[in-house]
Amino acid sequence: MNHYTESLAFLVVAAPALLLAALGVASLLDRRWSEPATSRLTRWAIAVALLSALGLVAGMLATGAPRVILDLGNWVEIHPHDAGTDHPGYHFQVKLVFDQLSIPFLLLSLVLCGTIGAFATRYLHREPGFNRFFVLYASFVLGMVLTSVAGTIETLFVGWELVGMSSVFLVAFFQERPAPVRNGLRVWVVYRVSDAALLLAAVLMHRMIGAGDFDKLLGGGAWPDGAASVSESQALLLGLLLLVAAAGKSALVPLSGWLPRAMEGPTPSSAVLYGALSVHLGAFLLLRAGPLLDASPALAVAVVVFGLLTALFGFFTASVQTDIKSALSFASLAQVGIIVAEIGLGWRYIPLVHLIGHACLRTLQFIRAPTLLQDYRHLENAIGGRLPRRPALWVRITPARWRVFLYRLAIERGHLDALLAVLVVQPFVKLFTWLDRLDRRATDTLAGQNRDEPPALDHVPPPSENGTGHHAALGHGHGPNPSHTPNDE
């Protein structure tokens, strides 16, 4: 790789990083940029990154190189204590890979982020949180770029975290209202599950192959070629962790409940986050780990099943929504499920093309969402009457006795939130509440204080709907919080 391609590859990441630094440092120093200056900085940063990526593509086409690798070395190295051991220790390698998977997703991210940035400049004009939005937007762009071109799972994790952090704060953008903050917290919890699975996958990769490099895991060939360098059982275990990470980020069933709640954010963030880019990160991760699916048929079947369940859930739920942003979010979910199923079937280019086309379409639809009623009136005026309304296809072909059941199931969004609360959240809270009391009992005994015996696990009170139950059990509650209201359904 010559100096030309190295410089272009570096600029692709450096431009959004400098944008985040410029906006973030100015905010910390309380010397915020003006709206026109912020808009110009954003446009220039996205333009530099996009032109650098296009120049890199031109260089690759001219030289016939299947990919370009920029290795920035190990930023962290932890050597084993025993010098005679065969274990190589831990190292955090920063490696960027530009290949047939990362470049299309990178170009898609930059084009759509640039479009949304220009739209948000006008949409949020004179909004009190204008500067805060663009700081989070810059963080999101940098996260998407890093995730797109990551050559190691550690680099991908950094970008993954930046996307998740900025997404949560954008959901809770309107902080003066309680609903966006509650829904942002819900998104944060699901993202934490996804992040934990990805972190466990990173640790497992180091235990299996001694590094977090995707080339070592996937055989070193340029995407989509390559073969997994681990056994079938190891591929299944590692792949299941990556599937959980993808499920959390892409809202696959059963972790789909956060997606409509994420619509509390501004329309620009809804378009670029949950309609176009971040909702596809799970599918992108599965595409990157494609050789693992080839090595483990059981893993491929699991991916197909989760994808089809998500597609069906999104299809039925989207058809009963009463607001446009929720309807679009569930429609996006249905397409993401189909993309995931295509990946599980062993296809690589078809889901990539599907992903790009779907992201562009949803971005346009989300941007036009605020003017939907006006567009509808213009269309009716043009045809001189009301538009004909026809029941959905599934309503026409479903027997009458099943319609009410399916309709109610779709209205209740599959009862996924309730099932997760009963089967996962309450048992975990009950267990850790009991462990907390047991720990307090042990520390009080060591300190010479007396405390009642810890209750049996079955008698630990479950968390109440308003969240006061487990806080009181942990010793932090001070009675009900009158300002807290249940989650909106």
Identify the meaning behind each predicted range.
Residues 1-439, 443-489:
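...captures the hydrophobic TM-helix bundle architecture rather than a specific catalytic motif
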